[in-house]
């Protein structure tokens, strides 16, 4: 990923951008807006199709070449003008060389009439790094998934059904990779039946290639001085559904109502993602308020645990970080969160080697190495080593994020009641004793390891790990700390009048009462991070019994990935795919026996701030039949069925 770079631009005498790499314009020099509306909106009949959408229905547009975002903004503008209130727009666009934020602002300033749509885009145009990046607008009514990277690497990872295509790469003669048979085959794989397509080019090899891929193509009048362009409709066969145990359940039809059990980050994010799509959601929390367990710490860290090798976990973290970072813009900076950066110290030779590999694998605006002197200057305190700095990261007050998510219109909170779920007819019913508190056709379990208290999830291999944080009173001297610093533990700049220090790992204890021993252990973690900061805090002179803190249980899985997705009925699953116990290469043509309307969002470990909000979007995509906001392989790596499949192949049960 180290070759990831922003677009290199030149600007002509009219202030319009040109690609230095491809030597081509981003839009018509005469009227880019009118060209977009003719080539893409009119050719795909979007005004008619937007207007015909039903309540809760979405139209999905796919694009090759996001560029300045002009096509997206014009489509959004038209959608807002003609679509009924309950309809949604999903837009997926691939871009190898995204514009830097300053360049995007300069380009979009050419179109002041688009300001009501371009300003929200510019406000969300941050923390965009390689891979899948999810953005949301208009209260979640408009979704934008950017695939940042080479089209022939990104599109094969996409799981979507595209209703209309915008083919808008640079001219075929200047950028032939965007007009290749391999790319056309991906367009066909991703196309919904009768998907439409528009493109400015009329090149014969493009027309023939699209016909070969399954599109019925025709030349139609071009815009302005361009005599012809291409339009078409996909008439080829539908794509294979893949392995049935990871196939999508049928998109939910009928009453759009859901129960979400659990009022931490995973539950609040799941509820918010569905509510943003027009669902009525009952959020059920057994405690008197939200974020009373692992999501209740005063400060959590946006720490990116990445791999230089593109593992599913690393890709989840990279996409999840961007999504959370954009969500945080809604909160009060300095009180609810702060983008002060995170410094991971290179505390030994092995860690230094790992950091060097990461610095070579990722863009410098995501992370870069600092020597000791640079690190101390940035942190404001003396440190034992340099390290890796994440400039866009920082600390978050998790309860504030939970509260913000839970205030999404359409969410009703029921707190102070522990419930059990029972299926009655077409609904899941939440019972407290003999009283049914709420019912809905869909339910999401988001109670960390306690999802095992619900019989359908009882055998999932989740474990609890106790963690304790220590709160230290800030001093005039300790306020010099300007960034989160991590080694084996972490310490954050003060929120109000307190620093948060943590966190311990205890795999055995089931007691949530804070202990003096773990306060002492946290102080030792601080000593490793910065003896100077320890002294500034006067921590050695603080009586342990007077220290304050809290303990909670992290929930994690054997592979450290969360469990996000639909849940199958185990006995029926074992019966349907019994052949896998003898030959794991078999793919039986039997539909997965899903538990109707039951989904999970759990197992986020110590990464919940990064992974839980995007997992809410992943769940909503599974439920609503939308493009997955993550690569398909990452979605499968997080799928609850992976453990049923593993046990079946290994001949294990329970």
Swiss-Prot record:
The keyword Oxidoreductase belongs to this UniProt entry's keyword annotation:
yes
Domain of life where this protein originates = Bacteria
**Where do the segments described as tRNA (mnm(5)s(2)U34)-methyltransferase lie?**
1-235
Q: Which GO terms describe its molecular function?
A: flavin adenine dinucleotide binding; oxidoreductase activity, acting on the CH-NH group of donors; tRNA (5-methylaminomethyl-2-thiouridylate)(34)-methyltransferase activity
Q: What is its main location?
A: cytoplasm
Cofactor needs:
FAD
A GO term (biological process) for this protein?
methylation
Q: Which cysteines are joined by disulfide bonds?
A: none
Enzyme Commission number(s): 2.1.1.61, 1.5.-.-
Q: Where in the cell is it found?
A: Cytoplasm
Q: Which PANTHER family match?
A: SARCOSINE DEHYDROGENASE-RELATED, TRNA 5-METHYLAMINOMETHYL-2-THIOURIDINE BIOSYNTHESIS BIFUNCTIONAL PROTEIN MNMC
State what protein this is by name.
Answer: tRNA 5-methylaminomethyl-2-thiouridine biosynthesis bifunctional protein MnmC
* Recorded name of the encoding gene: mnmC
């Amino acid at each position: 990923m180290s070759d990831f770079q922003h677009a290199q631009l030149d600007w002509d005498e009219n202030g319009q951008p040109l690609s230095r790499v491809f030597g081509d314009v981003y839009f018509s020099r005469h009227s880019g807006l009118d060209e977009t509306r003719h080539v893409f909106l009119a050719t795909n009949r979007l005004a008619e199709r937007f207007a015909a959408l039903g309540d809760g229905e979405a139209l999905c547009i796919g694009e090759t070449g996001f560029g300045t975002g002009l096509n997206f903004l014009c489509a959004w503008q038209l959608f807002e003008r003609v679509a009924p209130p309950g309809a949604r727009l999903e837009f997926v666009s691939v871009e190898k060389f995204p514009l830097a934020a300053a360049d995007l602002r300069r380009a979009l300033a050419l179109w002041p009439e688009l300001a009501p749509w371009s300003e929200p885009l510019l406000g969300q145009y941050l923390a965009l790094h390689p891979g899948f990046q999810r953005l949301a607008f208009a209260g979640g009514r408009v979704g934008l998934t950017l695939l940042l990277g080479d089209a022939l690497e990104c599109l094969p990872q996409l799981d979507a059904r595209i209703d209309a295509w915008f083919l808008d790469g640079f001219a075929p003669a200047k950028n032939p990779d965007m007009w290749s048979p391999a790319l056309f085959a991906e367009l066909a794989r991703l196309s919904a039946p009768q998907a439409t397509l528009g493109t400015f080019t009329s090149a014969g090899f493009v027309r023939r290639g699209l016909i070969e891929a399954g599109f019925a193509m025709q030349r139609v009048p071009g815009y302005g001085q361009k005599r012809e362009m291409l339009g078409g409709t996909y008439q080829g066969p539908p794509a294979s559904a893949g392995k049935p145990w990871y196939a999508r359940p049928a998109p939910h039809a009928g009453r759009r109502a859901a129960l979400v059990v659990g009022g931490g980050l995973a539950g609040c994010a799941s509820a918010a993602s569905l509510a943003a799509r027009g669902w009525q959601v009952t959020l059920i929390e057994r405690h008197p308020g939200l974020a009373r367990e692992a999501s209740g710490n005063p400060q959590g860290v946006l720490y990116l645990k990445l791999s230089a090798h593109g593992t599913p976990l690393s890709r989840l973290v990279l996409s999840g970080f961007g999504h959370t970072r954009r969500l945080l813009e809604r909160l009060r900076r300095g009180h609810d969160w702060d983008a002060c950066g995170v410094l991971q110290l290179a505390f030994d030779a092995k860690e230094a080697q790992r950091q060097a590999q990461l610095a070579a694998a990722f863009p410098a605006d995501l992370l870069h190495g600092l020597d000791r002197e640079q690190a101390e200057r940035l942190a404001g305190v003396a440190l034992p080593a340099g390290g890796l700095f994440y400039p866009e990261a920082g600390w978050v007050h998790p309860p504030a994020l939970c509260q913000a998510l839970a205030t999404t219109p359409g969410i009703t909170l029921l707190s102070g009641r522990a419930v059990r779920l029972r299926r009655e007819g077409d609904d899941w019913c939440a019972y407290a004793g003999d009283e049914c508190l709420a019912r809905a056709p869909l339910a999401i379990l988001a109670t960390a390891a306690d999802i095992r208290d619900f019989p359908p999830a009882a055998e999932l291999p989740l474990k609890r790990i106790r963690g304790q944080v220590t709160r230290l009173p800030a001093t005039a001297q300790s306020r010099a700390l300007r960034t989160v610093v991590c080694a084996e533990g972490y310490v954050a700049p003060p929120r109000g009048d307190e620093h948060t220090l943590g966190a311990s790992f205890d795999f055995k204890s089931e007691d949530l009462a804070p202990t003096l021993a773990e306060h002492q252990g946290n102080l030792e973690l601080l000593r490793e991070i910065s003896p100077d900061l320890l002294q500034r805090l006067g921590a050695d002179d603080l009586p342990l019994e007077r220290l304050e803190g809290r303990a909670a249980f992290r929930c994690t899985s054997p592979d450290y990935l969360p469990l996000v997705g639909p849940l199958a009925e185990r006995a029926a699953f074992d019966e349907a795919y019994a052949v896998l116990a003898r030959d794991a290469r078999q793919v039986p043509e039997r539909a997965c026996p899903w538990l109707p309307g039951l989904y999970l969002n759990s197992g986020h470990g110590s990464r919940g701030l990064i992974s839980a909000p995007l997992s809410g979007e992943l769940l909503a995509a599974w439920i609503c039949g939308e493009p997955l906001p993550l690569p398909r392989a990452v979605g499968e790596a997080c799928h609850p069925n992976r453990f049923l499949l593993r046990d079946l192949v290994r001949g294990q049960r329970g």
